[in-house]
Amino acid sequence: KTYINFSNKNSIPLLFSRSSFPYKKIGILVSDDFSDNSPVNIAFDLASTLSADVTALNISQPKFLQPEHTSTSNKNTERIQDLALSNEVQCEIVNAEGNEAKVFSSFTDKIDLSIVSQTSQSNWQGKKIAEFILQNAKSSVLYIPN
């Protein structure tokens, strides 16, 4: 929590290393943030530089909570696939359902580096998701400040 506050206040990315180098599989959450310093763009830049693959985890709420989510989600996954092609990086999209923080954290044993930031959801919820992943990830985590 303190590290996230420091990172955000000083605009410094932080790497939480968990001895998972070399980074051959980079994991990200599918989101609608495609800005220059977004986890999505940074993941593809790093993957291109390190000759790594990207795995994008597309986590949706259970259908009874949010039935009309698929069109936005499909647009985001299409944009991620376009980024993969333009960066000449292998990208796998994995679809899952449930709590974003818990599902992504449980997925980190299959990747070497997770790239996260506060999500575009409400500020406190996005921060809690990032904190949970930082504490529970089995891979190294690169936190990108907003």
Task: Give the predicted meaning of each segment.
Residues 1, 63-71, 124:
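Short, flexible/disordered intra-domain loops and linkers
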Residues 1-22, 108-146:
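Gly/Ser-rich helix-loop-strand patches that form or flank binding pockets
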Residues 3, 43, 80, 104, ...:
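Aromatic/hydrophobic pocket-lining residues that form π-stacking "cages" and hydrophobic walls in ligand
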Residues 35-36, 73, 130:
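Short, conserved glycine- and acidic-residue-centered signature motifs
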Residues 39-40, 100, 125-129:
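Amphipathic coiled-coil/heptad-repeat helices and related helical stalk/stem segments
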Residues 91-95:
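Conserved transmitter core of two-component histidine kinases
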